[in-house]
């Protein structure tokens, strides 16, 4: 484990947090409750210690998150005493929106993308921190640290600004905003090593244990509640699995694993040859799926 490398990444991220807090009028941090959000929260607390985090955390709740994620979210808000905003798209809730009834693409657009834009508009945020990393996915590989969004929250890769060294351009007109990615230069392995080094709390779903899963289209989907339909030709099996990425439970694939400690997870990361986002069903909706979602306002 290269401590100098991790400390350099930490210092860069803390600098970005402080820059945004000083430069923008009304920032917010998107809190998805996953491992990257856990690191973001830890870095934000470090950046402004011994004071409190000077901006709220926003969780866009799709109504289909893992139960353990919601319990963990609420416990973290209680333990660390940060301001937590939770937003659900009311139109989506009224429609009974869900991945089984409306499909993954429509569900994600309504409950995540539209829900996020509603929340950003409601509170008038001009900057929003997110945990995206350039190593995750090809459209994120070309993302800036300061990602400019127009008045409709849309991302245009051709209109992004040059970033020289650690100089960031945060100028926005009324209605425009910046999405900020302090973890841009981190890798998945960096995240796990930092979590281990700093003893950062994470959702237990990242650790392997016996869980009820159904194999569907080659993906292991955990049966998290009774809303999940089980086909006549499907069988719920108890398997030792964990998650590399977390989202809506019907759209998140588990991986078979026995790694139930952080050193074991790090060892898996050193050997794996697949992207963590292979477990995200929404990334496979169509070619260039993530880039299209970002252009529509997705994070």
UniProtKB/Swiss-Prot annotation:
The keyword Manganese does not apply. Keywords: ATP-binding, Nucleotide-binding, Nucleotidyltransferase, Transferase. With CysN forms the ATP sulfurylase (ATPS) that catalyzes the adenylation of sulfate producing adenosine 5'-phosphosulfate (APS) and diphosphate, the first enzymatic step in sulfur assimilation pathway. APS synthesis involves the formation of a high-energy phosphoric-sulfuric acid anhydride bond driven by GTP hydrolysis by CysN coupled to ATP hydrolysis by CysD. Disulfide bonds: none annotated. It is an enzyme of class 2 (transferase). Pfam families: PAPS_reduct. One of its GO terms (biological process) is hydrogen sulfide biosynthetic process. InterPro entries: PAPS_reduct_dom, Rossmann-like_a/b/a_fold, SO4_adenylTrfase_ssu, Sulfate_adenylyltrnsfr_sub2. Its EC number is 2.7.7.4. This is Sulfate adenylyltransferase subunit 2. One of its GO terms (molecular function) is ATP binding. Heterodimer composed of CysD, the smaller subunit, and CysN. Pathway: Sulfur metabolism; hydrogen sulfide biosynthesis; sulfite from sulfate: step 1/3. Belongs to the PAPS reductase family. CysD subfamily. It catalyses: sulfate + ATP + H(+) = adenosine 5'-phosphosulfate + diphosphate.
């Amino acid at each position: 484990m290269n401590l100098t490398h991790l400390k350099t990444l930490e210092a860069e991220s803390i600098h970005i947090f402080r820059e945004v807090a000083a430069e923008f009028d009304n920032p917010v941090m998107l809190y998805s409750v996953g491992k990257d959000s856990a690191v973001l929260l830890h870095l934000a607390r470090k950046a402004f210690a011994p004071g409190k985090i000077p901006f709220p955390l926003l969780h866009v709740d799709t109504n289909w998150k893992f139960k353990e994620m919601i319990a963990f979210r609420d416990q973290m808000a209680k333990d660390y005493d940060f301001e937590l905003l939770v937003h659900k798209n009311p139109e989506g809730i009224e429609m009974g929106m869900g991945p089984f009834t409306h499909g993954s693409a429509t569900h994600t657009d309504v409950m995540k993308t539209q829900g996020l834009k509603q929340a950003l508009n409601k509170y008038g945020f001009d900057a929003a921190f997110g945990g995206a990393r350039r190593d995750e996915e090809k459209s994120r590989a070309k993302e800036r640290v300061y990602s400019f969004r127009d008045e409709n929250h849309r991302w245009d890769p051709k209109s992004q600004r040059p970033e020289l060294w650690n100089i960031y351009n945060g100028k926005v007109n009324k209605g425009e905003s910046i999405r900020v990615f302090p973890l841009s230069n981190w890798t998945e392995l960096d995240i796990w090593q930092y979590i281990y080094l700093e003893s950062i709390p994470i959702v237990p779903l990242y650790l392997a244990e016996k869980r009820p899963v159904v194999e569907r289209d080659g993906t292991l989907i955990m049966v998290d509640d009774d809303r999940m339909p089980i086909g006549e030709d499907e069988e719920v099996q108890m398997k030792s699995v964990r998650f590399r990425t977390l989202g809506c439970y019907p759209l998140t694939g588990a991986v078979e694993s026995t790694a139930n400690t952080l050193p074991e997870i790090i060892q898996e990361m050193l050997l794996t040859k697949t992207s963590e986002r292979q477990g995200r069903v929404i990334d496979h909706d169509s070619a260039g799926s993530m880039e299209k979602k970002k252009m529509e306002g997705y994070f």
